[in-house]
Structures are given as structure tokens and as C-alpha cells.
């Protein structure tokens, strides 16, 4: 009987691990303007963060220099470069829903605004990122796709 219980516990634990997909890795945004690397914020934390690691257009056409956070409401931060900028932070795994992270924020350098955000890994290569003000119902979702360093962002089609 004890063996049977151990077997059920081991298989049950293995199944719960299999249901948790890894969010860590490189993601391209829906508009393909950027690649974001998502990983743990620190080794001691379960929180995840995202950093801008590639831009389709890294040079500001007005200045001829690397793009900066020029729309940030904090004037002291307007000179920081977009490459290397943390734009996702504070996400914790949802205890009730596997592959879902809540409690975080997303920063939009295109608007200079920070929004509440939740993230759902719908399959190993698809991430639903929902930014909102107040409650998720009043938000907007984007679908991000897992990518590689070598995969190019599509040219601007606007």
C-alpha cells in the first residue's frame, strides 16, 4: 500500500511539473518592433522580468543616435537607452492557474506609461500579454511569439 501511495505521489508531482511550461526565453512583440528576454528577476525570487534586448529600429531618426526613453514622465530617466531597459517587472506565478503570472507591470516606452499587466503562456511558443488600468476587463492584449536571436524582426509595414 505504501508503494502504491509513493507511485501516485511521484506521478502526480511529475504531471504537475509537466503542466508548467517555461516562460523564460526570447519573445518578439506582436508588432515585431522589439524582442524581450523574459527570465527570473533574481535567483532568489520567483518573480519574472522582461528586458528589451533588440529593436527593429534601434536608431532614433531625429537624433541619429540610439533610441532613449524620451517620453518617460520622469525627466531624469529620459536619457536612458531603450536597449537593456526592463519593461516587464514584478510578475508572480498565479497559485490557482498554471502558466499564468499576475501582479506585474508593463512599461510602454512608446507612450511613456506603465500599466498593470498579467501574462498567460497559452502554449510553449505563445504568450498573451494583457496591459490594463484598474481591472483586466478594461485592458488590451497582445500576442507575443517565442523567437531566437537569429530570427529577424519584420521590417516596418506601417
Each PLM stretch: what is its role?
Residues 17-26, 153-155:
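N-terminal helix-cap/turn-to-beta initiation motif at the start of protein domains
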Residues 128-132:
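C-terminal charged interaction modules
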Residues 123-125:
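Residue-level recognition of beta-strand termini and adjacent short loop/turns
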Residues 24, 30-32, 36-116, 149, ...:
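Central antiparallel beta-sheet cores of small beta-barrel/beta-sandwich binding domains
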Residues 133-158:
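Edge beta-strand at a domain terminus
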Residues 3-14:
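Sec-dependent N-terminal signal peptides
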Amino acid at each position: 500500500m505504501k508503494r502504491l501511495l509513493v507511485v501516485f505521489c511521484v506521478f502526480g508531482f511529475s504531471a504537475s511539473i509537466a503542466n508548467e511550461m517555461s516562460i523564460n526565453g526570447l519573445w518578439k512583440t506582436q508588432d515585431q518592433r522589439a524582442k524581450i528576454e523574459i527570465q527570473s528577476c533574481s535567483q532568489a525570487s520567483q518573480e519574472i522580468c522582461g528586458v528589451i534586448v533588440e529593436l527593429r529600429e534601434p536608431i532614433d531618426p531625429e537624433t541619429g543616435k540610439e533610441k532613449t526613453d524620451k517620453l518617460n514622465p520622469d525627466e531624469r530617466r529620459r536619457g536612458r537607452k531603450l536597449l537593456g531597459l526592463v519593461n516587464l517587472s514584478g510578475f508572480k506565478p498565479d497559485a490557482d492557474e498554471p502558466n499564468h503570472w499576475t501582479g506585474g507591470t508593463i512599461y510602454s516606452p512608446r507612450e511613456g506609461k506603465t500599466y498593470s499587466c498579467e501574462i498567460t503562456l497559452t502554449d510553449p511558443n505563445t504568450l498573451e500579454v494583457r496591459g490594463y488600468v484598474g481591472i483586466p476587463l478594461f485592458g488590451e492584449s497582445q500576442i507575443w511569439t517565442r523567437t531566437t536571436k537569429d530570427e529577424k524582426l519584420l521590417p516596418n509595414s506601417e
